[in-house]
A protein has these predicted regions:
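Short, well-structured alpha-helical segments in soluble
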Residues: 154-165, 274-286
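Hydrophobic alpha-helical signal peptides and transmembrane signal-/tail-anchor segments
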Residues: 1-13, 17-25
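Amphipathic helical "hinge" segments at domain boundaries
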Residues: 30-31, 47, 89-158
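Periplasmic-binding protein-like
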Residues: 106-107, 167-172, 230-232, 264, ...
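Hinge/beta->alpha junction and helix N-cap segments in small-molecule ligand-binding domains
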Residues: 113, 121-127, 145-156, 206-216, ...
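Flexible loop/hinge segments that line or gate small-molecule binding clefts
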Residues: 172-213, 297, 323-335
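N-terminal helix-turn-helix DNA-binding module of bacterial transcription factors
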Residues: 16-103
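Flexible loop/turn connectors
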Residues: 279-384
Length: 384
């Protein structure tokens, strides 16, 4: 193959001269815009792929962006084979400029004042990490990226919306209804939340049946012969925990068990809060034989606190958690828990958010409440 080179002089203003050496291979595959089989220097364009495949640039664009309803399978395979062979990667910046989308979703974790004072790191919370992982998985499937930020002031969310170049945001632990209404009025992009108390026609909000969740766990204890059942969580701190507390009381009432406020331990539904409750149950020689709570991490703390007080789990104290996180399988004994199907919550919220970003609306309701169920393991003993 013959080859040669040219020295190209480019004269710029102010008598500035820059010299570019361009190696020109007489084989045109080395021209700028091609890869010549070397992906590390690939600068291939849609036109290059179209020329190699013998199709239009629009067809190549449709294949890359998944708009293939009018593209034959043979053409798709041919275009994809060229993309793979030459290591072509779409330029996201160029795509963003052309369709005015950043392909970035902001994930905001809203901290309350108690969390800030306690120095809570929500990224260490298994529920949060599981939820973010499930969201990121769905976004990745749709070629979206994430920006994650925790905020301690509600006003920070509005500030982030103004300064972040995001196509939409997902809020974990959303603020009270009044502030969320204000946020929705000032929002410049679609918003999705989980377990928000605000009902707004434009807000995507995915919840689970919280009241039913604690109803099921309490009834499960009752069906195994327990009547002195503790509830562990500061239920006054959020509407979600309040709903779960109502489920606990409903199960007692339906089974003619008198509610005893002494069996309510108003600790944070965290590992540390669980340890405090477990220690207290064990040290007071309480008649309590079972404990239900609103988070798996708290349930694990209850088991550890009770053990430190000399109790055996589940012989002396049966425990049921909430969330059915993977770590339930690694405790000793394995933790029985209420499943609210976190992956499904994440998938539904993400799909509705992306649909709204793409079309401006959603084909179904923005509000959805998923069902819950008990996942039986080893942390409950029958007294019968």
């Amino acid at each position: 193959m013959n080859s040669g080179f040219f020295i190209v002089f480019l004269f710029l203003p102010e008598k500035c001269v820059r010299i570019f050496y361009i190696i020109y291979m007489y084989d045109s595959s080395f021209l700028p815009g091609n890869c010549y089989g070397r992906t590390e220097v690939c600068s291939m364009t849609l036109k290059d792929i179209a020329d190699l495949a013998g199709v239009s640039m629009m067809t190549v664009s449709n294949v890359i962006n998944g708009k293939t309803s009018r593209v034959s399978q043979k053409t798709r395979d041919k275009v994809n084979a060229i993309i793979e062979e030459y290591g072509y990667v779409p330029n996201l910046n160029a795509r963003s400029l052309s369709n005015k989308k950043s392909h970035i979703i902001g994930i905001i974790i809203s901290l309350d004042e108690k969390d800030v004072l306690r120095g809570t790191n929500y990224f260490e919370n298994p529920y949060v990490s599981t939820m973010i992982g499930a969201i990121e998985k769905e976004l990745q499937k749709n070629e979206y990226f994430t920006m994650i930020r925790s905020v301690s002031k509600n006003a920070d969310i509005i500030s982030l919306l103004k300064n972040w170049n995001v196509d939409g945001i997902i809020i974990l632990y959303p603020a009270a209804g009044e502030y969320m209404a204000k946020l929705m009025d000032s929002a410049t992009c679609p918003i999705a939340t989980f377990d928000c108390e605000l009902e707004h026609s434009n807000l995507i909000n995915i919840t689970s049946n919280d009241e039913k969740g604690l109803y099921l766990s309490t009834k499960y204890m009752i069906n195994h012969g327990h009547s002195a059942i503790a509830f562990v969580a500061d239920y006054k701190s959020s509407h979600v925990l309040a709903n779960r507390f109502n489920g606990y009381k409903r199960a007692l009432e339906e089974n003619h068990i008198t509610f005893n406020p002494d069996y309510v331990y108003e600790y944070s539904p965290s590992y540390e809060g669980g340890i405090q409750a477990g220690r207290e149950i064990a040290s007071n020689s309480s008649p309590v034989t079972a404990a239900v709570t609103t988070a798996d991490i708290c349930a694990i703390g209850i088991m550890e606190g009770a053990r430190l007080g000399g109790y055996r789990i589940p012989v002396d104290l049966s425990v049921i958690g909430y969330d059915n996180l993977t770590l339930c399988q690694y405790t000793l004994p394995k933790l029985t828990s209420v499943s609210q199907n976190i992956p499904q919550k994440a998938k539904l919220a993400t799909s509705l958010l992306l649909e709204k970003i793409r079309t401006g609306s959603v084909s179904s309701s923005c509000q959805a409440a998923l069902d819950v169920e008990i996942v039986d393991r080893q942390s409950v003993i029958s007294l019968y």
